[in-house]
Amino acid sequence: MKALTGIKVIDFSKWLPGHYCGMVLGDFGADVIKVETPAGDDTRRFFPEALPGMSYWHLALNRNKRGITADIKTEGGRKLLLRLLSEADVFLEGFRPGYLARYGLDYATVREINPQLVYCSITGFGQTGSYRHKPAHDLNVIGLAGLNSLDDVGSACAVSYTHLTL
């Protein structure tokens, strides 16, 4: 038996941080349900494709997950997601602050149907502050922090760091 056996995770994340988090939770035995929009997850279309419509990135980061499609812009899609969340232990989401509130899927609303739910919002700059609505990925944050200026291969004091390799 794995450490997270019996834990149900709803993964409605976007991009690497959320996909990776859900993957690790699944590796530890959690029942992870990946929710995709009707258009499918953007990572499906990354190059190179392992299979038609499935990139290596998508396959690697979504191992140990079951998948469903839900359109939160429709009442049926919202009801489906709320039903899943009512029975879940963890909710992973990776949208800008306030986006899910438009659809009644924000923390305050979801907490009413499942007070025990761990609601994990993954954003580039957090929920508060002047940058909260800005999109960000690793490269943006590294640049803003000034790390790129230290990554001079010819310099004796260059900083070495490794990007994620799957």
Stretch-by-stretch model annotation:
Residues 1-164:
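N-terminal helix-loop segment corresponding to the beta1-alpha1 unit
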